[in-house]
């Protein structure tokens, strides 16, 4: 099982954006498999695609993942162009992790509907793939997006639990990403995804990634609780309770997810400190 590092782009009180470049550079040196972001719109997060584009320029090997980006909050043609551009400038290191989103304010602030977000997302995904294939879109007679490095589409991981998500995944995705769950909930989702994958006649097997949080330094613990409770609102207590707070808990988390067939476990930072990445690398024995 690979170990990824989630950048703290949703942490509160980050007053120096260059810290993301420092963490990215060090994470690659330490041997992490990927750098990931999470994101909302109605919250003072650093925007995911911009952070990952900067990280791409500061690195040369490490993978890049949005985990997840709220797809229906974005204009689809622009999102297709942004994702394909990041895929190209990173040399094929980018994976677009997407979810539908469940908080109405993320849609209100963008002027987009909340109740019809699922239907809109279905239409948007089809339009994005047409753009990636180089097809002219309504209003133009020529391609509008760079072609992805694989010639077909930017790799997509889907998050969520709805039945409709499974249909999107087997149509457009390479696998599933779980945010804020447990090894047991991943087992449940793997069974559902695997069944849908086989039913759709897809070849090979879907990829599985999962997100968890950690805070290994005293300075990280001090701000982690406040940041997580603010970001997750009514779910904050549950997320805070699941934070890995020492090396033993990091290793236990790794063993539990590896045992259920997770391909990559992403430990997400709760504080913007290079030292936290170094502590995690030591705890996970990846260096």
Regions found by a protein language model. Give the residues of each.
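Active-site-adjacent structural elements that line small-molecule/cofactor binding pockets in enzymes
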Residues: 1-287
